[in-house]
Amino acid sequence: MPKYYCDYCDTFLTHDSPSVRKTHNNGRKHKENVRFYYQKWMEEQAQTLIDQTTAAFQSKPNSQMPPNAPPGLMPPPGMLPPPGGMPPGRMPPQGLPFPPPGPIPPPPGAGGMRPPHGQMHMGGPRPQMGRPPMSLRS
C-alpha cells in the first residue's frame, strides 16, 4: 500500500487514509511548515522582482533626459522642481513661469459670482452658477 508523502514536512505518513492526512494537515508542525514554505516562496518572488527591476534600470539610460543632453540641462516640461525650489544658479524653463502669489484664479469659463471671502459653500450639491434659485424666479 503506497504511503502518503507530505512535501511541506518532508515526511511519509503512516497510512494513506483521509483521516490520517486530515489529522496531519491540522497539526501545528505541518501548519508551521506550510507557512514557512510560502513565506520563503514570497521572499524569492520579491527578490526576483527586485533583480529584474534593477537590471531594467541598469540597461536603460535615464529616460527623463533626452539622449546626448549636456550636463546641467533642465528636465523636460512637466517635471517639477526638486523640493525646496530650484537649485542656485538655475532658472525655470521658458514658457513655464511660476504662478503669481495669492489665491488661485478660477479656470477659464467658470464665470458667475463667487461667495464673499470667508463664506464657503458647506456640504450638499453646489448650486449652479448664473441662474437664480427656483424660489427667486417669478
Swiss-Prot record:
Localization: Nucleus
Protein's organism: Nematostella vectensis
Quaternary structure note: U1 snRNP is composed of the 7 core Sm proteins B/B', D1, D2, D3, E, F and G that assemble in a heptameric protein ring on the Sm site of the small nuclear RNA to form the core snRNP, and at least 3 U1 snRNP-specific proteins U1-70K, U1-A and U1-C. U1-C interacts with U1 snRNA and the 5' splice-site region of the pre-mRNA.
Alphabetized Pfam families for the sequence: zf-U1
Listed GO CC annotations: commitment complex; U1 snRNP; U2-type prespliceosome
PROSITE patterns noted in UniProt: ZF_MATRIN
Coiled-coil blocks: none
Entry protein name: U1 small nuclear ribonucleoprotein C
Record carries keyword Cell inner membrane: no
UniProt record similarity statement: Belongs to the U1 small nuclear ribonucleoprotein C family.
GO BP term, example: spliceosomal snRNP assembly
Record keyword DNA-binding present: no
